[in-house]
Regions:
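Short, glycine/acidic-enriched loop or turn micro-motifs at the edges of active sites
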Residues: 19, 39, 74, 178-180
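Carbohydrate-associated surface elements
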Residues: 22
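Switch II (G3) loop of P-loop NTPases
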Residues: 11-19, 173-178
Length: 190
């Protein structure tokens, strides 16, 4: 958080929070996103219900003006829609939704509006397509389609998360050391 001193009131912050950070949370951001819920950190949480409830804290304290973005392709995540108070956008790689979605021929839309091609996304992996669908749903109406496309084409990802290291003898090497659970490590290989 070395940039905290440079943050102005009109700036927007994007923060990824773990279940450990969310478990005691009693306030929610204006925009909340849950990409996927799967059995993670069950060595710390007493059971899956505790883990899911911790994650849901990100949206439970929103008001009627809040925006929640959920993955329609993940049943546990989609079920969180029952707990939202404001506008809820669903995103999907498989079917049309009220948020961002990807068609079978690789076109990305928000509702009925075409945005870009899936192939425009520079960073590899179907999970990154889902991340873009979530991000588009989170910023729709506040960020132009042109900016969304530019970011997709130019963003190289974040350090330690499927970070391209080099290509040697036809093999592409990636650093995915941030993957802290088996499911995250497996997703990074797809």
């Amino acid at each position: 958080l070395p940039e905290i001193r440079d943050v102005k009131p009109e700036d927007v912050a994007v923060v990824e929070l773990s279940s450990f950070q969310l478990i005691s949370m009693r306030r929610s951001p204006n925009v909340a996103v849950i990409t996927n819920l799967s059995p993670n950190h069950l060595d710390v949480h007493k059971d899956m219900d505790e883990y899911v409830n911790a994650k849901k804290n990100v949206l439970l304290h929103q008001n009627a003006f809040g925006r929640t973005v959920l993955n329609a392709d993940n049943a546990l995540t989609a079920a969180c829609a029952a707990d939202t108070r404001g506008m809820t956008y669903m995103f999907s790689r498989r079917e049309k939704t009220n948020g961002a979605w990807c068609s079978a021929d690789g076109k990305i839309y928000f509702g009925d509006e075409y945005i870009m091609e899936e192939s425009d996304i520079r960073i590899p992996g179907k999970h990154n397509v889902e991340n873009y669908l979530a991000a588009i749903s989170a910023v729709w109406g506040d960020v132009s389609k042109e900016v969304i496309r530019t970011v997709a084409k130019e963003f190289n990802g974040v350090e330690h998360r499927m970070e391209f290291v080099r290509e040697l003898d036809g093999v592409r090497w990636y650093n995915d050391s941030i993957a802290t659970s088996p499911s995250r490590a497996m997703i990074g290989t797809l």
